[in-house]
């Protein structure tokens, strides 16, 4: 079961209002489609990306760099999907 490698890299918050309700909803919806553990860290705080409450508590403003950590059997696909949301500025429609 330890065949998978954890993935870690930086993502940048680009929405003008930071991580607010709409991007958080997209993150949670995307993350829950994967079995991997997915978290974001910012300013000494860590959030489970499958929890809207955790993500709200991060308080990440526009321009913030967050550390994305993904660990699990589908980590590469999960990391790619979450990264795509950040890179697109959350412009994808659900």
Model features per residue range: what roles?
Residues 84-92:
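A common structural junction motif
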């Amino acid at each position: 079961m330890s065949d998978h490698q954890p993935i870690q890299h930086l993502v940048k918050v680009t929405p003008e209002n930071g991580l607010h309700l709409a991007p958080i909803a997209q993150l949670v919806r995307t993350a829950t489609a994967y079995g991997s553990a997915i978290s974001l860290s910012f300013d000494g705080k860590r959030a489970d990306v499958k929890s809207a409450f955790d993500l709200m508590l991060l308080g990440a403003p526009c321009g913030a760099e967050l550390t994305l950590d993904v660990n699990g059997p589908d980590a590469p696909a999960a990391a790619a999907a979450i990264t795509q949301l950040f890179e697109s500025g959350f412009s994808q429609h659900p």
